[in-house]
A protein has these predicted regions:
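Extracytoplasmic small-molecule ligand-binding "clamshell" domains
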Residues: 1-39, 198
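Flexible hinge/capping segments at coil-to-helix
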Residues: 66-87
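Ligand-binding cleft/hinge of the Venus flytrap
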Residues: 1-11, 92-118, 125, 147-154
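Short helix-initiation/N-cap motifs at beta->coil->alpha
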Residues: 13-25, 111-126, 130
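A ligand-binding cleft/hinge motif common to bilobed small-molecule-binding domains
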Residues: 22, 28, 36-47, 97-101, ...
């Protein structure tokens, strides 16, 4: 967003660090004008906030599996065809929609979706390790911070768990829904398109994530 800020001479950004809950409440109330939290597009969010047409980033989503199964499950198609059991997902979670979309396109070999309320990530990893489920639908950055990193809270599982990618999910800034927000969204879209076309977004992605996260996003 700082690169967007530099493009928009008519706007002066003031940055505030906060929790996800406060960000969402603040955006609805008008306390904040714009917020970024790696938010995916959902119809529910689009009713509450202005969501620009152009993403600011992407989350790489994939599957955490047991290391012993990393040759068996190399792609989402492998997982589906081998009838792998997926850790339950809340229907309110945007990840539910990703699997639902996959199943609609692969009705001959869908992934079984089980609805569940929220649970601790530690439980999901433990369930996979003990064989209760075969995979946890997990964001790459979350897996790296939680398991791969030496100071990660679940690093003790690093030699027992593996992760493979499925696709990139575009992430968007959320903007307070009012006339001012609608106007800003149009200015943002113009700026972000320029940053995309001149290669700035890809360079920033390489700088912070060591890869171009946009390359994982479907082009259709």
């Amino acid at each position: 967003m700082k690169a967007v800020d530099e493009k928009l001479a008519n706007y002066q950004f003031e940055y505030t660090g906060t929790s996800d809950d406060d960000l969402l409440i603040g955006l609805e109330s008008g306390k904040y004008d714009i917020g970024t939290k790696g938010a995916w597009y959902t119809d529910e969010r689009a009713k509450k906030f202005v969501i620009p047409s152009e993403p600011v980033g992407a989350s790489i989503i994939g599957f955490t599996v047991r290391k012993e199964d990393e040759q068996k499950y190399k792609t989402i198609d492998d997982f589906a065809k081998n009838k792998g059991k997926l850790v339950p997902i809340s229907p309110q979670n945007a990840q539910w929609n990703v699997i639902t979309s996959y199943n609609e396109k692969h009705q001959d070999a869908p992934i079984e979706l089980t609805a569940a309320e929220s649970f601790k990530v530690a439980d999901a990893y433990a369930w996979v390790l003990e064989g209760r489920y075969d995979a946890f639908f997990d964001i790459k950055l979350s897996f790296e911070k939680a398991v791969t990193a030496e100071d990660g809270p679940y690093h003790q599982y690093a030699d027992k768990l593996s992760w493979f990618p499925y696709k990139g999910i575009p992430t968007y800034p959320l903007i307070h829904r009012d006339e001012k927000g609608e106007k800003f969204a149009k200015e943002y879209e113009k700026a972000i398109k320029e940053l995309k076309e001149d290669g700035t977004l890809a360079k920033l992605s390489q700088q912070y994530f060591k890869e171009d996260v946009f390359s994982y996003v479907d082009k259709d």
